[in-house]
Amino acid sequence: MTNHGGLFQMSLTINTNPAAIRASFNLTENNKNLQASLTRLSSGKRITKPADDAGGLAVSMKLSSSISRTKAAISNIQNSLSFGEVQDGALQAGARIVDRLAELKSLSLDVMKSDADIENYNTEFRSLQQQLYAITAETFNGVSLFASTLATGGAITFGHATTGKHTISVFTSDRGNAGSVVSLNKSALSAALTFKSLTNADQEATGSGITIAAVNSGAAIDIQNITVSFFTVALENIATLRAENGATMTRLQFAEDHLRLSSANLEAANSRIMDVDVATESTALAKYNILSQASAAMLAQANTTQNTALMLLG
């Protein structure tokens, strides 16, 4: 380009075509932007490679990990709730059996009943005690529903806190054991059905003594050797266990609700970082599509300008 009397004139050359070079550069850039826009819209992601937003991608990766851990914690809580529901169902069944035992004992006290009648009651009475024991031995996916002895091998005491293998730790945050924990106790059903002696229906039953949960027929108590008061205490003990179970279930349900809300908020935050704005990106796509076509047309036009120089040579 030369200046003649204040006027700029474009040189006409054969070896170099500046207009075509600039048009080619613009075509390359517009095609690159067009491809990037197509990739964002097809993937639904604003960040398709680290170069798009390195900082945002790093934050998104941490949020995604937190979301995964939160969902895992929710799954664990749901399994714990299932454990508690099965446990409560077993406690309900145990309560019905104890209630039936009390009824049989009361029926056996009828002076109009013969020895044969009482023996018939006793047959059912002894059989139900074995069913009670079967309930105390129930498991959930291989995990015992109820506690039997302490981790040290000693007897547990009903109404007192249990430790060790009788407590299941449920982690209720995405931080694992560094976060909040709910302790799910294995109810001391065996202790609730065990008393110090047949002459004393002790309110604070212990895990060693006389039990109405018989491991076999030989260990069962005869109907005439126990009083109705024992069943009253046993029912009160089971009611306490169900109350403890219900309290833990309520806490776990609140923990699950909190985690679900937290997961939703984390996903929303991650979406704001990673997800593409379809309206904005569609506008950009249309823009770069037009520019690419225009650049291609102008490149073709620029490539014809050197024909003028050839005409001058002719």
Residue ranges and their predicted role:
Residues 2-20, 28, 48-49, 61-65, ...:
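Amphipathic alpha-helical coiled-coil/heptad-repeat segments
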Residues 30-42, 93-103, 258-268, 272:
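Extended, amphipathic, non-transmembrane alpha-helical segments
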Residues 48, 279, 292:
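Nucleotide phosphate-binding site architecture
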